[in-house]
From Swiss-Prot:
One of its GO terms (cellular component) is cytosol. It comes from the Bacteria. This is Exodeoxyribonuclease 7 small subunit. One of its GO terms (biological process) is DNA catabolic process. It is an enzyme of class 3 (hydrolase). It comes from Streptococcus pneumoniae serotype 4 (strain ATCC BAA-334 / TIGR4).
Amino acid sequence: MSKQKKFEENLAELETIVQSLENGEIALEDAITAFQKGMVLSKELQATLDKAEKTLVKVMQEDGTESDFE
């Protein structure tokens, strides 16, 4: 079983991909592959953030202090 990357590792990898695409010194085929990888990472990061938000909302609701998280 492979260890799933941490949020921070995925974010750092996404930032590296964005920088390489922005500098324009990457071959087209590599840019397409990097873009696709970046989209996957972006979706994974968003899912992690959504899960964290739901967890916080649940904790706050159980505590009785807040019922909506925005």
